[in-house]
Amino acid sequence: MVKIRLSRFGSTHNPHYRIVVTDARRPRDGGYIENLGHYDPRKTTETYLKVNTERAAYWLAQGAQPTQTARRLLKAQGVKVA
């Protein structure tokens, strides 16, 4: 099953996350199919959340299942999530 979820990167005590499309069996920070954007939970910049909405909509149409957090972030960017 293909999932849209967060993959952590950044340094200790300074988390950043990639919003990625990956196989559900892969580890959290393992390889991914496509990078859809990034998220900074500390909101240190104006662009703390950036998502390629066209590609996100494409993957959702292909049947990718977003995690609860990814769903919330996609909705915040205006992506229609069922």
From Swiss-Prot:
One of its GO terms (molecular function) is structural constituent of ribosome. One of its GO terms (biological process) is translation. One of its GO terms (cellular component) is cytoplasm. InterPro entries: Ribosomal_bS16, Ribosomal_bS16_dom_sf. It comes from the Bacteria. Pfam families: Ribosomal_S16. Keywords: Ribonucleoprotein, Ribosomal protein. Belongs to the bacterial ribosomal protein bS16 family. This is Small ribosomal subunit protein bS16. It comes from Deinococcus deserti (strain DSM 17065 / CIP 109153 / LMG 22923 / VCD115). The gene is rpsP.
